[in-house]
Amino acid sequence: MMLEFSEVRLAPNFVDYMQAWEMQQKLHDAVVEGQAPSTVLLLEHAAVYTAGKRTEDHERPFDGTPVIPVDRGGKLTWHGPGQLVGYPIIALADPHAIREYVATLEDILIAVLAQFGIKGERVDGRAGIWLLADAKGPTRKIAAIGIRVHNGVTMHGFSLNCDNDLAPYGQIIACGITDAGATTMELETGRNISPAQVLPHIIKEFSAREATLIGAPAHEAVVPARATEGATQ
């Protein structure tokens, strides 16, 4: 099966988190059963905080803002306008190669950033994509990754800061990290870069890696019926 892409909604028609979560669940079940192709959902959320399973109480919003618990690995993060979110629902070619899948997501994000003149990096021991300390500031995070794999099919995914407001990060300990901040593509380049502008580049990079990502329909693969949390946030 070929990898498909679904542009759910971008600004100004932001997607409620729970609506997107229901879409993920239904699509995941269909991919597991071989009733739908592997698909990447691409969208912008209405503002929301979500908490992975490792989130601690002291990391939650200081003002008591509600947080939605989710079944990915990782900790607390924010999604909202100006941030491109991708939920790849993919029957993996190798259902056990979780680290390799996360590395592929990192490669995709790094390649997209490079097309806008931004040098994204991996940082040992920390998930996501970073900009290393330079004249513009200390090491800072520009993209988060948080996944779950169940029955050989992925859920959740990545978020890439395009032109979003960073103020919401000031209300939380994002991703459990206290010694680094966040940034956006707009801040790094001095140009307005919206999720709509970035989306075609994401599709291009996923498509280039399609052959290594996608396996047989999950219901045909021999996969233990268990969930696996991946490196996140």
Swiss-Prot record:
Belongs to the LipB family. It comes from Renibacterium salmoninarum (strain ATCC 33209 / DSM 20767 / JCM 11484 / NBRC 15589 / NCIMB 2235). The active site is at C175 (acyl-thioester intermediate). GO terms for molecular function: lipoyl(octanoyl) transferase activity. Substrate binds at R72, G73, G74, K75, L76, T77, W78, H79, A144, I145, G146, G157, F158, S159. Residues 34-214 form the BPL/LPL catalytic domain. PROSITE patterns: BPL_LPL_CATALYTIC, LIPB. It comes from the Bacteria. The record marks K141 as: Lowers pKa of active site Cys. The gene is lipB. Signal peptide: none annotated. Its EC number is 2.3.1.181. It is an enzyme of class 2 (transferase). It catalyses: octanoyl-[ACP] + L-lysyl-[protein] = N(6)-octanoyl-L-lysyl-[protein] + holo-[ACP] + H(+). In the reaction, the free carboxyl group of octanoic acid is attached via an amide linkage to the epsilon-amino group of a specific lysine residue of lipoyl domains of lipoate-dependent enzymes. GO terms for cellular component: cytoplasm. Catalyzes the transfer of endogenously produced octanoic acid from octanoyl-acyl-carrier-protein onto the lipoyl domains of lipoate-dependent enzymes. Lipoyl-ACP can also act as a substrate although octanoyl-ACP is likely to be the physiological substrate. Pathway: Protein modification; protein lipoylation via endogenous pathway; protein N(6)-(lipoyl)lysine from octanoyl-[acyl-carrier-protein]: step 1/2. This is Octanoyltransferase. It is found in: Cytoplasm. Keywords: Acyltransferase, Cytoplasm, Transferase. GO terms for biological process: protein modification process.
